[in-house]
Curated annotation (Swiss-Prot):
The keyword Metal-binding applies. It comes from Escherichia coli O6:H1 (strain CFT073 / ATCC 700928 / UPEC). HAMAP family: NadA_type1. This is Quinolinate synthase. Transmembrane segments: none annotated. The lineage of its organism: Bacteria, Pseudomonadati, Pseudomonadota, Gammaproteobacteria, Enterobacterales.
Length: 347
């Protein structure tokens, strides 16, 4: 008898931390990357959760720092023939699905995502087969193979709007893979949602009791929460949203002190947006609890300067993203549906 994969009990081995670089080494690799980007007609696309020095380099070279939805838009529209995707593997796959004519490079193809790892395609297909009457909606944080099974792909920035739209059509939903985001969307929309039970190893670690103590210490602070966090954390929030939405909330909220419950990589762009405000990390440990990710994705941390330089210089199978063409064509359908729907929201 086969055993159903249980993402709740899965323990993912973390990658080794990159070797720290000296100041001189960082300067060397920065200049090398800038030169190689020009020589290769390449542009950097970096996620908010990468390290600050990577985001800074993307800015300086005319690239993009954004959430996964805007990364997809930017990469597809940019005239560069090569995209250097600083993020995790599903982001590189998504770039290749949307831009098959372009060379897609990543600093490492071993940069995983616990949500992706927690949704193996064979088990997910069986889950969908058991509920054939439901519309399949998968989060962007999934493999190309899982996207290919879906009716829709969605990011956290438009999840509530999309599910509300599908609910208005009377559709019942399979949601995968993030259980916390699925629960949040269900609560916001009232839709009939059957959730896969995955979780982000970063957001799943935020602790309610420790956050309560921090709130008591700073009663004037607003709490900003990503909806991949547990429900108890979301319920404490003054603002809930995707990475880009949290940065927008930081600007509009009147509070001068902000407690932020998402990957601390976001602090680079958020501090730019609100230079006069104090940003505090929401706690991931306390009351005897320990943390593994400690508010920073270990796979995002693999996107170092040395690895980026090697990707641009060496190319090849160790850095280039490939997606089977038949799989790409199937995954493109729900991705295009997402982009078309997002365009209607932007007016």
């Amino acid at each position: 008898m086969s055993v159903m994969f249980d993402p709740d009990t899965a323990i993912y081995p973390f990658p080794p931390k990159p070797t720290p670089l000296s100041i001189d080494e960082k300067a060397y690799y920065r200049e090398k990357i800038k030169r190689l980007l020009k020589e290769r007609n390449a542009v950097m696309v970096a996620h908010y959760y990468t390290d600050p020095e990577i985001q800074q380099l993307a800015e300086e070279t005319g690239g993009c720092i954004s959430d996964s939805l805007e990364m997809a838009r930017f990469g597809a529209k940019h005239p560069a023939s090569t995209l250097l995707v600083a993020g995790v593997r599903f982001m590189g796959e998504t770039a290749k699905i949307l831009s098959p004519e372009k060379t897609i490079l990543m600093p490492t193809l071993q940069a995983e995502c616990s949500l992706d790892l927690g949704c193996p395609v064979e088990e997910f297909n069986a889950f969908c087969d058991a509920h054939p009457d439901r519309t399949v909606v998968v989060y962007a944080n999934t493999s190309a193979a899982v996207k290919a099974r879906a009716d829709w792909v969605v990011t956290s920035s438009i999840a509530v709007e999309l599910i509300d739209h599908l609910d208005s059509l009377g559709e019942k939903i399979i949601w995968a893979p993030d259980k916390h985001l699925g629960r949040y969307v269900q609560k916001q929309t009232g839709a009939d949602i059957l959730c896969w039970q995955g979780a982000c190893i970063v957001h799943d670690e935020f602790k309610t009791q420790a956050l309560t103590r921090l709130q008591e210490e700073y009663p004037d602070a607003a709490i900003l929460v990503h909806p991949e966090s547990p429900q108890a954390i979301v319920e404490m929030a003054d603002a809930v949203g995707s990475t880009s939405q949290l940065i927008a909330a930081a600007k509009t909220l009147p509070h001068q002190r902000l407690i932020v419950a998402t990957d601390r990589g976001i602090f680079y762009k958020m501090q730019q947006a609100v230079p006069d405000k104090e940003l505090l990390e929401a706690p991931t440990a306390g009351e005897g609890a320990t943390c593994r990710s400690c508010a920073h994705c270990p796979w995002m941390a693999m996107n170092g300067l040395q690895a980026i330089a090697e990707a641009l210089e060496l190319e090849g199978s160790n850095h280039e993203v490939y997606v089977d063409e038949r799989l790409r064509e199937r995954a493109l359908v729900p991705l295009n549906r997402m982009l078309d729907f997002a365009a209607t929201l932007r007016g």
